[in-house]
C-alpha cells in the first residue's frame, strides 16, 4: 500500500508531537507555576518570592556561572533581601571565616529570592572585599532542570511546608551538591580551617544522629554520586515523608540513605569500609565539625573550659552555633566570651563593624 499525502502528514505530525514532548520534559510547567506567582509585593512569602522577577544587574544567576572544584556553598532562603541585603552578623561571620579558610577556592552564597545590593550595611561591605566570596541568584524554574527534582514539585512542597526556609535550604543544598559537588554549610558555623581534609563526608551532631548542616560530596567518585543521587531521589519519591520531618528533613534523609548504603542501623557502626568510602565523621568530642555537639551555650562562656576551647580551635575544622537554638541569645560586644574570641580571630573584618551585639 502506497502512503497517501494525508497519511504522510499524519505521521510527520505524530513525530513532531513526540519531539516536542521529549524536548519539553524537565522544563518548568509555567502554566502550573502561575498560581504561585500571586504575589503580595509588600510581604512576599515562600515559595512565591522565589518566582518574583529579579534584577540581573544586582546578582547573576548561578546556572550561568562556571563552578570551580572544591567550592563551598551557603544557601540563604529567606524572602527578606529585596529591599537590601539584610544578612545578620553571625551569618556574615560564617561567610568571612569560610573565605579566609579557603583562599584558593570560592565561597558562593546562593539566594533563591530577589536581592538588592544597594546600600549594604557595614558588615556586608566587608564581605564584598573578599575576591573569593561571591553572591548569586538561584532561578528555581531553571535550577532543577535535569536533576531528580522537578521545579514544580519543589514549589508545591514549599507551599505546603510549615518549615519552608529550612526545607528549601535542605533541598537546594542537596541539588547544588548533585550538580556541582563541593561542600555545603549552614550559615551558623564559624570555619576554622580547610573543609577539604577529606572528601565525601557527613558529621554526627550526636552519637545518635547525623546532620546535613555540613555535607561534602565529590561527584567525580562513585560513592559521592550514589549518596547524593539517593538523597534527591528519596525527596522526589516520598515528598510527604520528607516534609513530615520539619526542620530535620536533611537529617532524616541522610539517615535513611546511609542506613541503606552502609547496611548498618547505627551511625557509630558505619565505617568507611562498610559505607564504600563515604566518611561518617565521629560525634563530639572528636568531631571536626560538631566538637561540642548540641552544647551551643559553651560559646557564651569565657573563663570556664579554656583548655577545651584551645583544643577545639586546634583540632576542629569548624564549630556549629546551632542557630535554631542560639538565635535567641544575644552576645554583647566586650564580654570576651568564646564566640567573640572566635569572631576576632576568624572573621575580624565583620567583627570590626559590630558595636553592640552579635
Where are these regions (language model features)?
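Small-residue hinge/turn detector
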Residues: 171-182
Amino acid at each position: 500500500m502506497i502512503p497517501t499525502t494525508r497519511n504522510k502528514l499524519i505521521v510527520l505530525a505524530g513525530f513532531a508531537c513526540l519531539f516536542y514532548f521529549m524536548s519539553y520534559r524537565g522544563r518548568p510547567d509555567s502554566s502550573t507555576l502561575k498560581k504561585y506567582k500571586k504575589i503580595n509585593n509588600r510581604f512576599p512569602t515562600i515559595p512565591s518570592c522565589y518566582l518574583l522577577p529579579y534584577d540581573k544587574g544586582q546578582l547573576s544567576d548561578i546556572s550561568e556561572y562556571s563552578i570551580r572544584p572544591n567550592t563551598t556553598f551557603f544557601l540563604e532562603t529567606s524572602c527578606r533581601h529585596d529591599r537590601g541585603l539584610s544578612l545578620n552578623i553571625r551569618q556574615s561571620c560564617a561567610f568571612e571565616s569560610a573565605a579566609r579558610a579557603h583562599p584558593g577556592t570560592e565561597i558562593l552564597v546562593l539566594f533563591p529570592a530577589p536581592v538588592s545590593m544597594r546600600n549594604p550595611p557595614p558588615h556586608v561591605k566587608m564581605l564584598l572585599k573578599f575576591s573569593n566570596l561571591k553572591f548569586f541568584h538561584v532561578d528555581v524554574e531553571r535550577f532543577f532542570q535535569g536533576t531528580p527534582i522537578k521545579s514544580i514539585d519543589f514549589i508545591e512542597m514549599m507551599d505546603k511546608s510549615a518549615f519552608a526556609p529550612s526545607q528549601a535550604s535542605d533541598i537546594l543544598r542537596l541539588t547544588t551538591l548533585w550538580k556541582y559537588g563541593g561542600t555545603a554549610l549552614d550559615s551558623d558555623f564559624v570555619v576554622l580551617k580547610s573543609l577539604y581534609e577529606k572528601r565525601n563526608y557527613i558529621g554526627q551532631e550526636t552519637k545518635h544522629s547525623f546532620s546535613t548542616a555540613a555535607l561534602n560530596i565529590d561527584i567525580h567518585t562513585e560513592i559521592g554520586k550514589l549518596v547524593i543521587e539517593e538523597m534527591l531521589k528519596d525527596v522526589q519519591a516520598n515528598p510527604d515523608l520528607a516534609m513530615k520531618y520539619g526542620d530535620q528533613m536533611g537529617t532524616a534523609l541522610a539517615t535513611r540513605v546511609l542506613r541503606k548504603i552502609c547496611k548498618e542501623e547505627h551511625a557509630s557502626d558505619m565505617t568507611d569500609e562498610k559505607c564504600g568510602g563515604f566518611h561518617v565523621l565521629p560525634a563530639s568530642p572528636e568531631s571536626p565539625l560538631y566538637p561540642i555537639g548540641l552544647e551551643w551555650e559553651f560559646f557564651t562562656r569565657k573563663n570556664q573550659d579554656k583548655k577545651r576551647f584551645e583544643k577545639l580551635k586546634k583540632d576542629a575544622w569548624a564549630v556549629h552555633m546551632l542557630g535554631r537554638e542560639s538565635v535567641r541569645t544575644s552576645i554583647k560586644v566586650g564580654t570576651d566570651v568564646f564566640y567573640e574570641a572566635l569572631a576576632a580571630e576568624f572573621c575580624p573584618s565583620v567583627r570590626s563593624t559590630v558595636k553592640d551585639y552579635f
